[in-house]
Amino acid sequence: MDLMGMMGKLKETQQKIEDTKKRLDTVLIDEQSADGLLKITVTANRKVKSISIDDSLLEDKEQLEDYLVVTLNKVIEKATSVNERELDAVARMDMPSIPGMDNLFK
């Protein structure tokens, strides 16, 4: 592949990555505490969309804080996994073969 062709392919890949990032803003990921008293929804780009807290948790600030930390960490981990998997797939699919760069996305 010539240099101009590679540059064109890289621009195409960049656009596909940007399109994927926009699409990931619409992918919702849910997580809840083990007992279902706290529910959090984020996008695959790790933006919090909603938090639902059962009234019983409002009586114990420390417990609520613990629930928030644990549940937020879980949902962010899930979102990060989806995000990385989707962006990696786009990059792998469209990256031109550049000598010496074979292991870049492994």
Swiss-Prot record:
Q: What is its main location?
A: cytoplasm
Q: Which GO terms describe its molecular function?
A: DNA binding
Q: Which HAMAP family would you find in this protein's record?
A: DNA_YbaB_EbfC
Q: Which Pfam families match?
A: YbaB_DNA_bd (PF02575)
**Any one annotated GO CC term:** cytoplasm
Q: How does it assemble?
A: Homodimer.
Listed InterPro entries: YbaB-like_sf, YbaB/EbfC
- Give the subcellular location: Cytoplasm, Nucleoid
The record lists the organism as Flavobacterium johnsoniae (strain ATCC 17061 / DSM 2064 / JCM 8514 / BCRC 14874 / CCUG 350202 / NBRC 14942 / NCIMB 11054 / UW101) (Cytophaga johnsonae)
Please identify the protein, giving its name as recorded: Nucleoid-associated protein Fjoh_2555
Coiled coil regions, renumbered to chain? none
NCBIfam families in alphabetical order: DNA_YbaB_EbfC (TIGR00103)
Keyword Repressor listed: no
